[in-house]
Swiss-Prot record:
Gene3D superfamilies: Immunoglobulins. Residues 1-19 form the signal peptide. Residues 20-133 form the Ig-like domain. One of its GO terms (molecular function) is antigen binding. It comes from the Eukaryota. One of its GO terms (cellular component) is immunoglobulin complex. One of its GO terms (biological process) is immunoglobulin mediated immune response. The keyword Signal applies. Keywords: Adaptive immunity, Immunity, Immunoglobulin, Signal. This is Ig heavy chain V region IR2. The lineage of its organism: Eukaryota, Metazoa, Chordata, Craniata, Vertebrata. Transmembrane segments: none annotated.
Length: 142
């Protein structure tokens, strides 16, 4: 009986580890004004295709600013953007790889900041913005 309980306990732990939601941004760095940079957010631990994905940034010394959102297949992959971006940013996603991309063009000094991806809506509003990546720093400077 003890052996069976141990087995159940180990399986439960492994299941918890394997199902842990993870988001990991990459692609940041030093970028010259007017250039382009593409950020990526690799995810795991959930059914990526079910969820909307969000990008949020934080400029030095400022609060969080919502950047953009891309919805899921059920919502035709529609993307929405913050007004300050003026068509310079483009969101895309690859459901087969569970990755969301943020293409940033004609980058400006005011785009400097830490960029975070976050899991958005997936059918339950209480799950919105619960999971975040660690962020990737974009520094715009000549």
């Amino acid at each position: 009986m003890d052996l069976r309980l141990t087995y159940v306990f180990i399986v439960a732990i492994l299941k918890g580890v394997l199902c842990e939601v993870k988001l990991e941004e990459s692609g940041g760095g030093l970028v010259q004004p007017g250039m382009s940079v593409k950020l990526s957010c690799a995810t795991s631990g959930f059914t990526f295709s079910d969820y909307w994905m969000e990008w949020v940034r934080q400029a030095p010394g400022k609060g969080l600013e919502w950047v953009a959102e891309i919805r899921n297949k059920a919502n035709n992959y529609v993307a929405y953007y913050g007004k300050s971006l003026k068509g310079r940013f483009t969101l895309s996603r690859d459901d087969s790889k569970s990755i969301v991309y943020l293409q940033m063009n004609n980058i400006r000094s005011e785009d400097t900041g830490i960029y975070y991806c976050s899991r958005g809506y997936g059918g339950y509003s209480e799950n919105w913005f619960v999971y975040w990546g660690q962020g990737t720093l974009v520094t715009v400077s000549s």
